[in-house]
Amino acid sequence: MSSTVLSVEPDALPRSGEDAAAIAEDARLRDDIRLLGRILGDTVRDQEGEDVFDAVERIRQTSIRFHRDNDQPARDELVELFDGLSTPATLRIVRAFSYFSHLANLAEDQNNIRQMRLQNGARPGSLVATLAHARAVGISAKELRHFFETALVSPVLTAHPTEVRRKSTMDREMEIARLLDRRERLQMTPEEIEQHEELLRRAVLTLWQTNMLRRTKLTVLDEVANGLSFYDYAFLHEVPRLHGVLEDKLNDDDGAGEELASFLRMGSWIGGDRDGNPFVTAEVMRGTLRLQSRRALRHYLDELHALGSELSIAAHLADISDELRALAENSPDTSPHRAGEPYRLAVSAIYARLAATAHRLGIDDIRAPVAESAPYAEPAELKADLDVLHRSLVANNSAVIARGRLRSLRRAVDCFGFHLASLDMRQNSAVHERTMAELIDKAMPGKSYMAMNEEARIALLAAELRSPRPLASPFVKYSEETVDELAVFRAAAEAHATFGPAAIPQCIISMTKGVSDLLEVVVLLKEVGLVDPAGRSAINVVPLFETIEDLQAAAGIMDRLLGLHDYRRLVDSRGGVQEVMLGYSDSNKDGGFVTSGWELYKAEIELLKIFEHHGVRMRLFHGRGGSVGRGGGPSYDAILAQPAGAVNGQIRITEQGEIITSKYSNPEVGRNNLEVLAAATLEASLLQPRLGAPCVGYLKAMDEISALAFKAYRGLVYETEGFEDYFWSSTVITEIATLNIGSRPASRKKTHKIEDLRAIPWVFSWAQCRLMLPGWYGFGSAVEAWVKAHPEQGMAYLQELNREWPFFRTLLSNMDMVLSKSSIAIASRYAELVADEKLRAAIFGRIKREWHSSIAALLAIMGHQRLLQGNPRLERSIRHRFPYLDPLNHVQVELLKQHRDHAVDEQALRGIQITINGISAGLRNSG
C-alpha cells in the first residue's frame, strides 16, 4: 500500500473550466501535500506499525465515500471500523489525522506565499494597488503623507482561547514551513534534495513525538509569552519594513525625500483584559509590562550590537557631523582599535545608555552595558541619538547606509517605544458599578449608589469628577473586589510613570449600558491621578457595545456623554478623539449572524451622525473574532464594508487565537497582512467615501431581512424547548472546557443557559460538529419570507444589493465561506449523540431545513451554481481538507459516545481533545 496517506482525491482537483494558471498552482500545492503526506505516512508506519497505518487509510477512504454520497453503508462501515479498534490504537489514528491537518495547512500557506511572490505586490489589498488607485483619482503623495500624520492602524492581540496548539508544536511546524520555503527558493542538486528531505523527515518525526496537548492550564503570563513570540516572528522587523516600503513609494512619486509619520502601532489585551478573568491582577499587569518592555529593549540592544559591527566607517575616509562627533566623545569605549571609528563609538554610547535604561526599568537579564551611563528618560531621547547618526550619514554622502539597519531601528523605536505594545485595560461595567457603589456608600453615609437612577448617578459622578478630594481612604476597609480594582488602576498609573503614557492608553468598559458606566471609570481614574479635576485625562475611556440592545442604544449614550461639559473637556484634552468599541461576538450570540452584522453597521451610521454633531473625531475599535460567527472574515473586505466615513484614517481591530498564528507566524505572510490593514484603512478613508451612502431602499430591505432572520434565530436558540439540552448533547462544549488553551473560564456562570455561555466556546462548539450555525442560521428563511412579501422586487433586488453594496456583498461572501466548511452529513452524526429521539428529530430537522434554505438563498442571490464559485482558490483549498478533516469528525463522535458512556475514561477524553485540535486546524478559523 502507498505511504501517501495524505493524498488528493479527484474531487479536490481543479474543476473543468478553470484556467491553466489555476491548474499549475494546484499542481504545486498537491506536490507539497503529497511530499508531506508521504513523509508523515512513513513516520506513522515506522513509529506505530503497519496495522495503524492501514487503519488510517481505510478510515480515510470510507470517510470520503460518506462525504461524497452520505450513504448508510459508509456510515455503518465507519462505526464497524472504530468498534474494532482499541482506545490506544484510536489515539494513534487521531494523532495521524490531526497532524495531516497541520501539515496540509503548511503546504497551503507555502502556496499562498508562492502566489504573493508571483503577483509581486500588484494584488487587491496591496499598497501597490491602493497607491495606484489613489494616483488615478488625483490624490498626491503629499496628500497621502498628510493623511498618515494623523492615521492610526492598530492590530490588537488578545488571549481569547481559540488557538489549541502548543507553542512547542507551532515551533516544530514553523521549522517545517521554513524547510518548505527553502525547497521553493533554491535550485538543488539531486543530492541536496535528498539531504533536504532528510531534514523534513527529522522535523516531522520530532513533531510526531511532541505532545500535541498541554498538560497544564496556561497562566496569564504564559499567554503573554506566547503573544510576545509573534514580535520576534514578524512585528519587530515587519512593522518598520512596511513603513519603509510606503515611505519609498511616496518619495518615488514626487522625489520629496520626506520621512513618513509612524501610523502602525501594536496593541494588546493579554495581561490587561480582566473581564471574566480573575487571574489578571495588578501584579500580573506589572509583569506583563515588564515582559513587553524586555522584548522591545532586547531587540534594540541586539540591533545596536549589529549596527556597531556594520558602521566601521573611518573618520579619515568619511566626514562626520559635529553632533555625531560630540556623541562619539561621550562613548565609554576606550579601545584603541576604535579610536578612529566615530560611528562605532557613538553606537556604543547609545548602547550604554539603553542598557542603563533597561536596568532602570527593572530588566536586568539582557545584554549588560560596557560602562555606567545615564539612562534614557523616554524613547524620544533614544530616537534623537539615533537621528544624529542618520543625519550625519545623509549629510556626508552615505544616505544608502542610513537606509539600512539604522532606518529600521529608528522606526522601531518610534513605533514600539519602551513599552512594545499599548496594553488595554478591560473590565465589565458591573464590576466598576459595584466598586463605585462601595466607595460612595462608605464616603457618603446615607447615600445608596445602587438605588439611584441613571440621572442621579450622572449628577453625582460629574460632581465627583470636579472635586479635588479622593473617594477612597486608606483608613477604610473595602471588599476584596474593590481593593483589587483600585490596585489595578494604581498599577496603570505606575505604568504611565515608568513606561510612558503609551503603555496603557485605553480603559475599555465591557457591557456598557449607560453614561454612568463611563463616568464611573473616569472617577476611578481620577482616584489614581490619570484624570484630574481640571479636565485633563491621560487615558482614553472606551465604551464597548456588545449586545443587539446595546448597539441600538449606543448613539443615544454617546450623545448624552459628549454633551456633558465635564466629560467633553477630557475628550478635548485627548486631541478631540473618542474611541468606541463594537463587539461582534456577543451580538452574534444574542441575535444571529445577519442581525449582528446589520445592527453593527447601523450603529456606526448613527454614531457618525452624533460625533459629527458634537465635532468629535470617532475612532472605531472592532472586536472581531476569527470565525465569521464572531465577526471574522477577510480584513480587507471587512474594512471596506464599513459605512462611508466610519474609518476616517483610524482603526483598531482585534487579532486573536488561531488567527494570530495564521497571520503572523511567518514574516512574509505577516508583512502582507499588515499591508492589507494599512491599504484598506487608506482606501476606506480616502477612496470609499467617493462612492456615497447606499440608497434608502437597500437599508429598508436589510432592516426587514434582519428582523426576519432575528426572529428565526431567536426562535431556535432561545425559544425552542429543549434546545439547551440538544446543544450540550450534540456538541463538544463540555469537553472543550477540559482543554488547557486559555486562562479564562469558558462560562460567566456555572449554568447550561446559552445566555451565560461565552461567545467563543459557543462558536467553537458549532464549528467542531461542522454546522457553523452562528455563521448563517436564519438567513434562508429570512430571504424566503422577504421575497414572498416583495414579489415586485423579488430576488432580482437582492442580486442588485450584492452587486452594488459592499456591506451586503461582504456579508454574503463570509456566509459562503462558512457554509462551504459545513457538512450536514457530518452534523447528522453529532445529532446521534442526543438521547431523546423526538428532540433530536425536531431540532436537527429544523436546522437541516434552514441549512438547505440558506444555501439555496445564497446561491440564488450570488448567481452561482455551487458554494465558493466566485473564489476558486479557497474552494480548492477547502476541498483539499475534507479527506483528512472528515475522519476526525467521525472519530470524535465515536469517542464522545465512549467517553459519555463511562464515568471515567481519560484515554477517550484525550482522544477527543486531540480531535478538537485537528478539526480546529483543518477549519483554520473555528473560534
UniProtKB/Swiss-Prot annotation:
Family annotation (NCBIfam families): PRK00009.1
Protein name from the UniProt record: Phosphoenolpyruvate carboxylase
Similarity comment: Belongs to the PEPCase type 1 family.
UniProt cross-references to InterPro entries, sorted A to Z: PEP_COase (IPR021135), PEP_COase_bac/pln-type (IPR022805), PEP_COase_Lys_AS (IPR018129), PEPCASE_His_AS (IPR033129), Pyrv/PenolPyrv_kinase-like_dom (IPR015813)
Catalyzed reactions per annotation: oxaloacetate + phosphate = phosphoenolpyruvate + hydrogencarbonate
EC number per UniProt: 4.1.1.31
GO biological process: carbon fixation; oxaloacetate metabolic process; tricarboxylic acid cycle
HAMAP family, sorted: PEPcase_type1 (MF_00595)
Lyase among keywords: yes
Residues at the catalytic site: H160, K589
Recorded superkingdom: Bacteria
Originating organism: Rhodopseudomonas palustris (strain BisA53)
Cofactor(s) annotated in UniProt: Mg(2+)
The UniProt record lists the keyword ATP-binding: no
Function: Forms oxaloacetate, a four-carbon dicarboxylic acid source for the tricarboxylic acid cycle.
Main enzyme class: lyase
MF term (GO), any: phosphoenolpyruvate carboxylase activity
UniProt-listed SUPFAM superfamilies: Phosphoenolpyruvate/pyruvate domain (SSF51621)
Entry GO CC: cytosol
Keywords on record: Carbon dioxide fixation, Lyase, Magnesium
